Amino acid sequence: MSFTSNFQKQIFIYLVCCFLFTANYSFSQKSEVKADETSKAKKWYDNINIRGYAQIRYNKLFETNSNLGCEQCDKSWGGTNSFFIRRGRIVFSGDVHERVYIYVQPDFASAAGTTNMIFQIRDAYFDLSLDSKKEYRFRFGQSKVPYGFENMQSSQNRLALDRNDALNSAVSNERDLGVFFYWAPKNKRELFSKLVNTGLKGSGDYGIFGIGFYNGQTANRPEANNNQHLAARISY
């Protein structure tokens, strides 16, 4: 009788120990999972992407007219110019919120005239999406004016060395300060991105329909006459 009682006590103690060990192990596992989830939770700045590019030119090759110049065009034309940093840009972009996208692009090779090289902001804007699919969005800040096709293309993707003067002269530097509205279905926005990312010379994601107001003074210049310009664009 005594042997049976002791044996039952031992079995009971063994089962209790197993239960406590299992419960402790399960709690430890859950704590580790929660700790991992906390440590892997992304901050808003983790979504910021940094990239850039530079373009260097030499325009003396096959030159026939050293007096040819164009303040609105390539500043390395004519005169004593030879090697020239046409563009030197760094891009900071990303979704800082589920409905807010930012894009900032400074240019370290901008020319104020025929000689001086200065730092200049090319793009500084944010997109505010009105829906979760980001099909309807407003763009606030300095950005490209939705006008033409070549004007919208990035210099990284364009086939020609420069944009044609006929269209580019309408919006020098392609950019201005304003507010624009863009609309495109989600699948079309994905298509716009695919055309650029696969090297098919797309114009970028400026919506199926775009419309907005801008100062009309070109980039990095304040409003001078309180007379905003209107631009609209439809693509298919």
What do the PLM-derived regions correspond to, one by one?
Residues 3, 7, 15, 19-69, ...:
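N-terminal periplasmic/intermembrane-space "pro-region" immediately following the signal or transit peptide
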Residues 41-62, 77-216, 224-231, 235-236:
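Outer membrane beta-barrel
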Residues 1-5, 169, 222:
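A general boundary/transition motif marking the beginning of the first structured unit of a protein
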